[in-house]
């Protein structure tokens, strides 16, 4: 899937320049693996990750937003629009 827009400044820098500033050092490898899986997949059914990623769609006010667990309360979240990843974010929404 194509990543169309990124909300988190550090995550954007990481994707565009491989610059880790703005991302906790202990999360970098896990984030790299998650992003690689998302880009390699044609759709969400093709995202193969370990059970610890806990891939799911949010409900309530954020219904339709996808979430993938990074570590502790940290999540990669994004929306899918026309098969493209939008509003990619790294956040603690708990």
Question: What are the functions of these language-model segments?
Answer:
Residues 42-66:
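A short, surface-exposed loop/turn module that caps and links secondary-structure elements
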Residues 59, 66-94:
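Enriched for short, Lys/Arg-rich terminal
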Residues 16, 43, 83:
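Residue-level marker of positions within ordered structural domains that often coincide
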Residues 1, 9-10, 18, 42, ...:
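Residue-level signal for pocket-adjacent positions within structured domains
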Residues 1-34:
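Arg/Lys-rich, positively charged N-terminal/basic patches that mediate binding to nucleic acids
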Residues 24-51:
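Short, solvent-exposed, low-complexity loop/linker segments
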């Amino acid at each position: 899937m194509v990543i169309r827009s990124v909300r988190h400044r550090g995550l954007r820098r990481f994707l565009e320049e491989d610059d880790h500033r703005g991302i906790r050092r202990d999360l970098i490898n896990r984030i790299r693996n998650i992003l690689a899986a998302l880009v390699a997949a044609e759709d969400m059914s093709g995202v193969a990750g370990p059970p610890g990623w806990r891939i799911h769609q949010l409900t309530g006010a954020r219904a339709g937003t996808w979430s993938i667990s990074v570590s502790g309360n940290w999540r990669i979240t994004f929306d899918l629009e026309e098969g493209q990843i939008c509003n990619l974010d790294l956040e603690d929404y708990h």
